[in-house]
Amino acid sequence: MDPAVSIRDCRAEDCTEVLRLIRELAEYEKVPEQVKISDQGLFQDGFGQDPFYKCLVAEVPPERRSKGGHTIVGYALYFFTYSTWKGRNIYMEDLYVMPEFRGKGIGKRLMRTVAEIGLEKGCTQMKFSVLDWNQPAIDFYLGEGAVDLTAAEGWHVFRFEADAMQQLASK
């Protein structure tokens, strides 16, 4: 693990950099067109009157900046949810580290910090999803003790997009 990397809470002024990393993750996941949020949207949703998410960033000192000149090199975005069976949960929406900084324990530190926050808040589970083709991420999570709920319990994740939500709500 690189002691020069600091893990800290995201600040409002980090939203542009976090959006850059969100776009990099979407590119890696082969769905760049799916990113519709703006840095203003991230700011409002994370730092407005009714915050919907929390975020951690991994930051390197200026002398260790990325090839592109960035000091924020990774992030973990999370929020709290609830299980009627288990109680409080924490959901890690994204975990991403820039490719040139991978293999240095940064992702593990980000994930560990999310777990620590969840435990401090009384959470009994930490949930997240992974694309079925992303074997490096699957192997990483399994190696850290995560359980693949699709394989182990047969759970599938569903979602309604906004138009389907509108249709459902108007029935």
Label each residue range with its predicted role.
Residues 20-34:
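Helix-loop element at the rim of GNAT/NAT acetyltransferase active sites that forms part
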Residues 122-171:
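C-terminal "cap" of GNAT-fold acetyltransferases
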Residues 31-55, 60-65:
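Active-site rim helix/loop that mediates acceptor-substrate recognition in acyltransferases
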Residues 6-18, 31:
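A short beta-loop-alpha structural element at the N-terminal edge
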Residues 58, 74, 103-111:
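Glycine-rich acyl-CoA binding loop
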Residues 95-102:
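A short, internal acetyl-CoA/4′-phosphopantetheine-binding micro-motif in the GNAT/acyltransferase core
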Residues 57, 66-79:
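Conserved beta-strand in the GNAT
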Residues 98, 109-125, 147:
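Conserved acyl-CoA
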